[in-house]
Regions:
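Extracytoplasmic copper-binding redox domains, predominantly the cupredoxin/blue-copper superfamily
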Residues: 2-4, 10, 14-112
Length: 112
């Protein structure tokens, strides 16, 4: 193969890979429930990511309550337990704790 052809072939390969959009690994973001608070209270994730709520209270159960059109309420989960949800659609998901409505949080889902 001539040197000029090799350079052209290598250049074509490099530029063809550059045109492929990056693929992001799906991630899980953790929200700790402690002292009757979601921590952090607001998280931002990409569509396809998961949020995992972990109950680190000593004695009480909690749930994660979204508006009905955004998924409704999780089962109650007790100290040491967790609940998780995958978010596929971009948007702002405001939630609270079913039994403790003063506990509030937000999941902001952006396009990948």
């Amino acid at each position: 193969m001539h040197c000029g052809r090799r350079v052209a072939l290598c250049s074509a390969l490099v530029f063809s890979f550059a045109a492929i959009p990056p693929v992001f690994a799906q991630q899980t973001v953790e929200v700790v429930i402690q002292k009757y608070r979601f921590e952090p209270a607001e998280v931002q994730i990409r569509a396809g990511d998961t949020v995992k709520w972990i109950n680190q209270e000593k004695r009480t159960s909690h749930s994660v309550l979204f508006a009905p059109e955004q998924g409704g309420e999780s089962e109650r989960f007790f100290p040491g337990e967790s609940w998780q949800r995958k978010f596929d659609a971009p948007g702002r998901y405001v939630y609270s704790c079913g039994p403790h409505p003063e506990m509030k949080g937000v999941v902001e889902v952006v396009a990948p």
